């Protein structure tokens, strides 16, 4: 390779949407015929006006619609080349994370339990010292530690969205 040559690699497609349509009822479609490829090591934003189906599409990607009877998803969604319907939903949800515009805490869980929810859902055991470190570091990193450090046992709904 010469100093002036450029080495390029083709990025790997990690998520593929193939003609995806989502229906809330047989008469009402929320998303119609969406096809896209999402590549490894890239950040992708789904943008559009309110009510156009952004959140609906994201929920289909991580199989949240299966929790609600009557919602139908057509087309194919492939995660790392495999149909998401052939994978355990929890595996899909671990692989396809989402950040919504207005995330909400679990209202019946304490602030501390909300912070630790990812560890618990993934079966990761931590010592009391590790838990304290995770809570402190996580809440400091988002600027909430000083506000909640004395109320970690209070419900997550205590936190304001504003």
Annotate each PLM feature.
Residues 58, 108-118:
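Short coil-to-helix segment of the ABC ATPase nucleotide-binding domain corresponding to the Q-loop/switch region
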Residues 70-72, 83-97, 121, 128-129:
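ABC ATPase NBD coupling module
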Residues 153-162:
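Conserved ABC ATPase signature
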Residues 45, 59, 76-77, 90-104, ...:
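ABC nucleotide-binding domain signature
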Residues 47-49:
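The feature captures the beta-strand-to-loop junction immediately N-terminal to the Walker
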Residues 17-20, 29-42, 75:
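Conserved beta-strand
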Residues 9-14, 22-33, 65-70, 86-88:
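A short, flexible loop at the N-terminus of ABC-type nucleotide-binding domains that lies
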Residues 76-83, 120, 128-150:
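Conserved ABC ATPase "signature" region
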């Amino acid at each position: 390779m010469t100093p002036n040559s450029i080495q390029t690699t083709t990025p790997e497609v990690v998520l593929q949407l193939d003609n995806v349509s989502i229906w809330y009822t047989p008469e009402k479609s929320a998303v119609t015929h969406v096809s896209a490829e999402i590549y490894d090591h890239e950040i992708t934003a789904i943008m559009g006006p309110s009510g156009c189906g952004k959140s609906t599409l994201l929920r289909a990607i991580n199989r949240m619609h299966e929790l609600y009877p009557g919602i139908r998803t057509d087309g194919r969604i492939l995660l790392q080349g495999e149909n998401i319907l052939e994978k355990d939903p929890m595996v899909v949800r671990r692989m396809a994370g989402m950040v919504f515009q207005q995330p909400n805490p679990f209202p019946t869980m304490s602030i501390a339990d909300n912070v630790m929810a990812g560890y618990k859902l993934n079966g990761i055991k931590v010592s009391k010292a590790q838990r304290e470190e995770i809570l402190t570091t996580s809440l400091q990193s988002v600027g909430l530690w000083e506000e909640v450090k004395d109320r970690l046992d209070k419900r997550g709904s205590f936190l304001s969205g504003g």
